[in-house]
A protein has these predicted regions:
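Glycine-rich, low-complexity segments
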Residues: 1-13, 37-71, 160, 191-216, ...
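Short, polar loop/linker segments at the starts of domains and inter-domain junctions
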Residues: 14-22, 80, 241-248
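Short hydrophobic/aromatic-rich beta-strand motifs
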Residues: 19-37
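Acidic glycine-/aspartate-rich tracts in secreted/extracellular proteins
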Residues: 32-33, 40-42, 261-262
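Short polybasic amphipathic segments
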Residues: 35-37, 185, 195, 232, ...
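Glycine- and small/polar-enriched repetitive beta-structure motifs of secreted/surface proteins
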Residues: 49-206
Length: 305
């Protein structure tokens, strides 16, 4: 049976000395009703109530671990911090309804509502945003004023994000185009070479009731003839698994040149990160259909003559 001893103190949040406890013993501070124990490493940790050096009245908050919720203030309510350093910096801030589990999870966070951080350093620096979910070591570790309503799943997922919001990153080291990118969904990192599913296309919104100024596309055969389909061998600057592989496709810079002043309408290249251009060849499908229609008309005209 675990022995419970009492530590009488006139100072709220006074912590028992490690030498006063045997491993596994519980110590109760009768002044502020905080409970402590000594872990296997010889450190004194709080159990069930916040280890609070600023205010003992944070409502409905539970902490477990050395310095978990260490500086929690009176406006930081309904939080759960489990693990050494988890949620340690909530003091003057108004963070509430957070769950941080793991060493230094949300350790430097101060403001916000409803974050879930599971894993060492998960959402370490996040402040001023709400409702981010990060599961895995170092997920969203560099988010500062970003991460709003984002989901990071897998070690280092979203680790490069700083101010970007409403991103979804799934898989090891998966990240958006840039640290400030928002509204992106990223599956895996740059070494992923196959996207497998039981269907071959992604269904997107195309309802006429959600569109206006509908006209026939002005782009067709003439534009298609300006494109340069290429064969190339990958030699990535970051040295990933695709290096040496031969593929067919387009060059982003050549697509931009073909689009000219109409690149915004055609949306063939994502330029958000100028150091890593990304092509959306699928946006050529409507133009290819128009080109086929124009060719069909030419063939029919020749046949009729």
């Amino acid at each position: 049976m675990t022995r419970i001893i009492t530590k009488n103190s006139s100072t709220a949040s006074a912590i028992p000395l490690a030498g006063d406890l045997v491993q596994g013993e519980l110590a109760l501070n009768v002044t502020d009703k905080k409970l402590y124990t000594k872990d296997s490493g010889g450190a004194v940790v709080s159990v069930g109530t916040p280890l609070d050096e600023n205010n003992p009245t944070a409502a409905d908050t539970v902490t477990l671990g050395l310095w978990a919720g260490r500086y929690i203030g009176p406006n930081n309510i309904q939080n759960t911090f489990i693990g050494s350093g988890a949620g340690a910096s909530f003091s003057a801030g108004t963070g509430r309804s957070h769950v941080a589990v793991g060493h230094d999870a949300m350790a430097l966070a101060t403001f916000g509502t409803g974050h879930v951080a599971v894993g060492e350093n998960a959402l370490l620096n996040i402040s001023g945003t709400n409702y981010a979910t990060a599961v895995g070591t170092d997920t969203g570790v560099n988010c500062t004023s970003g991460g709003q309503s984002s989901v990071f799943l897998g070690m280092l997922a979203g680790s490069q994000v700083t101010t970007g919001a409403q991103n979804v990153c799934i898989g090891f080291n998966s990240n958006p185009t840039s640290a400030t990118s928002s509204y992106q969904f990223t599956l895996g990192h740059t070494d992923i070479t196959s996207l497998r599913c039981n269907v071959q296309t992604i269904t997107s919104l195309s309802d006429a009731r959600d569109k206006t100024e509908i006209v026939d596309t002005p782009y067709g055969l003439d534009f298609i003839n300006t494109l340069q389909p290429r064969q190339f061998k990958w030699a990535t600057r970051d040295g990933n698994i695709k290096d040496g592989k031969v593929e067919q496709g387009f060059i982003a810079q050549e697509l931009l040149a073909a689009a000219g002043d109409n690149k915004a309408d055609l949306n063939l290249v994502l330029e958000e990160n100028p150091n890593k251009l990304e092509a959306s060849a699928g946006n050529l499908v409507p133009i290819l259909v128009k080109a086929i229609q124009e060719l069909t008309a030419q063939v029919e005209q020749l046949e009729n003559n």
